[in-house]
């Protein structure tokens, strides 16, 4: 089904792969589509260390307030590139009184003041709008959402934390080394009933755990590309984020051209293909004809098995993934019963998915028992077409509830299942508690990811888990007509029309960032959390869902940091900056520093591999406003989380082995300021126990740029620009 090839390969004329060729690998690397787009946007003058300027940017209502506030504090006067502000995450305004709609009105006032594009709530999810209106072949787009991926439309898109968008707003650059490029060689044609989520889940399952494509660009090539409709490609592409890759790009063809023509932007198309000789650092071959209906079991998109494998041995498969608590979902006939289905967001709410779901459900009923199914078309143009052609009526008639464009089910702000229930979703993630359950209140729920087709098949079977490939359905050939009249009525298009006389509209929850100190000569850090999970997600570092309503108030949001993973973290971090260490610790610190006064004191968390998941900067900024000085890790799950740490003034330390300290211990890093200035990557530190005992600890950092070092010295990105 999927084959990984670690060694590099040459692609000749877009058709033949070979291990060796007469052209050097270094020269042939320039033949990839990714290389051509990256170098076209590079301002550094060399192709090793890139300084990228993007064509457009996008943020949603969890992130844009913080980004604009940071940019304001750093001297923003107008948006220098098209910047789209969508309102698709906290659209329901159900938590915190007025605070969500206050943020939306702040966003509209900012779009008017600085010249932005404002998409009101319920009009579109962020990535649907960007696909429909802003993508273009050869473009690059930066978004403050990890699923910023438009590669199937010829657009290299990257999801990053807010500070990276701030840099673009201030006419600075996105600085990265030239990434490796992995060929995703698609062959064959999907069988009937297989959808984009099936392919995506299979791909994630094959590459995630090994980090095979981590921080690399996925370039989709091969004869199988032409066999996929454009929205099928979009559905695969948006999920590449879950592989931990940096970005993605696809060859373009007549189907890509037709997409742009349908959306009234024929000029956005151009043919993209590798040069006659292109070199890829590794390759993944996906035989589309062998992909089955898939399911990603809780609690990660990489927990991939076929639906029929799970059905054949439910207890064995569930036990393999540590999910024995789901044995209760197995009925007396050995079937797995689920309580909820959801088709939503940038991955699920695509037109083709909903048409296929309607084909399966047409004339059937989902029943009047526990099982419920909700569908969220990803944009008003999609909803408009579904209504015009009668597909919406078919879904409603089967018992499906049809909702507006909203990302809520993807991050815990809508369709939270009942306690102990299993939900199957065509959405992006299924991390622990991301669906909205509160473990502190003894709540738990489970989300498994499936394609819309198998979700509809399950719904048609009364909630009994069913693979769409087991059905004999005559699927409608989707015939989408794009009608953007809703956008023309409601979207504010202000790019190039900045009006400095407009006053920003602040609600009572919108607060400025607190002051953050510059780096001291030495730092003393108290260990406030020690996490030994294989991977720590950003949802665990700062929960999503209703917590996100407080996103515009840094101090209030910080109260929720690690609340579902380590509920005592916040109180420990606060105590660290408010209380002096005991005499034994102070004496040891003074002895090691040779000074009477204590160094700068902060907190630190250790996690083996933190930062998988969301691009939300709050995963780092919440630690910082509580006094966080650093993270210590064996490795960082994503480039974007490491960047968030640096941009908020926290050192991304690495340890070669699991460190021998525990919560309550102190870490003293001597000469840290001089080490950063001198570009040293190795830091001499000490673990100090409460009784004053000490032992040495070696910490490192890797590949910090000069700008990143200066940001650390200044204390955060805001200070860096102020100075």
Stretch-by-stretch model annotation:
Residues 1-723:
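Fe-S-dependent hydro-lyases/dehydratases of central metabolism
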């Amino acid at each position: 089904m999927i084959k990984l090839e670690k060694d590099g390969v040459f692609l000749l004329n877009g058709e033949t792969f070979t291990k060796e060729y007469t052209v050097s690998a270094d020269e042939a690397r320039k033949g990839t589509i990714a290389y051509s787009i990256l170098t076209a946007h590079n301002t550094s003058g060399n192709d090793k260390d890139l300084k990228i300027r993007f064509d457009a940017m996008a943020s949603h209502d969890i992130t844009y307030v913080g980004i604009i506030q940071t940019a304001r504090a750093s001297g923003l006067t107008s948006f220098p590139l098209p910047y789209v502000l969508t309102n698709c995450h906290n659209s329901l305004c159900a938590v915190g009184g007025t605070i969500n709609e206050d943020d939306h009105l702040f966003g509209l006032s900012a779009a008017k003041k600085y010249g932005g594009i404002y998409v009101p709530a319920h009009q579109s999810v962020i990535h649907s709008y960007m696909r429909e209106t802003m993508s273009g072949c050869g473009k690059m787009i930066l978004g403050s959402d990890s699923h910023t991926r438009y590669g199937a439309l010829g657009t290299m898109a990257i999801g990053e934390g807010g500070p990276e968008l701030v840099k673009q707003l201030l006419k600075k650059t996105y600085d990265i080394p030239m990434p490796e490029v992995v060929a995703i060689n698609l062959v064959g044609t999907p069988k009937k009933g297989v959808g984009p989520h099936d392919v995506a889940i299979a791909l994630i399952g094959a590459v995630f755990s090994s980090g095979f494509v981590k921080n690399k660009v996925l370039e989709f090539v091969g004869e199988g590309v032409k066999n996929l409709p454009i929205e099928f490609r979009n559905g695969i592409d948006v999920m590449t984020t879950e592989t931990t890759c940096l970005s993605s790009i696809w060859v373009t063809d007549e189907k890509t051209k037709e997409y742009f023509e349908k959306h009234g932007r024929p000029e956005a198309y151009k043919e993209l293909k590798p040069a006659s000789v292109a070199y890829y650092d590794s390759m993944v071959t996906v035989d589309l004809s062998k992909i089955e209906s898939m399911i990603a079991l809780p609690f990660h998109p990489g927990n991939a098995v076929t639906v029929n494998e799970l059905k054949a041995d439910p207890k064995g498969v569930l036990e393999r993934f540590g999910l024995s608590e789901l044995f209760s979902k197995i009925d007396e006939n050995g079937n797995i019963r689920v309580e909820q289905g959801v088709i939503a967001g940038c991955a699920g709410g695509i037109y083709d998915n909903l048409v296929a779901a309607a084909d399966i459900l047409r004339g059937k009923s989902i029943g009047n028992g526990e099982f419920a199914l909700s569908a969220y078309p990803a944009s008003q143009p999609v909803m408009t077409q579904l209504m015009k052609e009668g597909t919406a009526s078919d879904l409603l008639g089967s018992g499906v509830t049809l909702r507006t464009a909203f990302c809520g089910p993807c991050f815990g702000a809508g369709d939270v299942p009942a306690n102990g229930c299993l939900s199957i979703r065509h959405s992006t993630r299924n991390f622990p508690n991301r669906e909205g359950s509160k473990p502190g209140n003894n709540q738990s729920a489970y989300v498994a990811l499936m394609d819309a087709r198998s979700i509809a098949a399950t719904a048609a079977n009364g909630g009994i888990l069913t693979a769409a490939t087991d059905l004999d359905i005559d699927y409608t050939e989707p015939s989408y007509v794009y009608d953007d009249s809703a956008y023309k009525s409601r979207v504010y298009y202000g790019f190039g029309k900045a009006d400095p006389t407009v006053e920003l509209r602040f609600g009572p929850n919108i607060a400025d960032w607190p002051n953050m100190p510059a780096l001291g000569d030495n730092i003393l850090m108290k260990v406030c959390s020690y996490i030994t999970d294989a991977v720590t997600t950003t949802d665990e570092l700062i929960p999503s869902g209703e917590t996100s309503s407080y996103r515009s108030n840094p101090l209030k949001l910080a109260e929720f940091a690690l609340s579902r993973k380590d509920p005592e973290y916040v109180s420990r971090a606060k105590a660290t900056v408010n209380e002096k260490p005991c005499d034994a610790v102070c004496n040891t610190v003074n002895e090691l520093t040779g000074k009477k006064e204590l160094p700068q004191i902060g907190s630190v968390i250790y996690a083996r591999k933190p930062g998988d998941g969301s691009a939300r900067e709050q995963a780092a900024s919440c630690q910082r406003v509580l006094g966080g000085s650093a993270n210590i890790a064996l490795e960082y799950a994503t480039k974007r989380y490491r960047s968030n740490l640096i941009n908020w003034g926290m050192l991304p330390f690495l340890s070669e082995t699991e460190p021998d300290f525990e919560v309550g211990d102190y870490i003293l890093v001597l000469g840290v300021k001089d080490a950063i200035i001198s570009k040293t990557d190795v830091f001499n530190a000490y673990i100090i126990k409460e009784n004053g005992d000490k032992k040495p600890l070696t910490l490192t950092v890797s590949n910090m740029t000069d700008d990143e070092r200066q940001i650390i010295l200044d204390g955060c990105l805001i200070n860096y620009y102020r100075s």
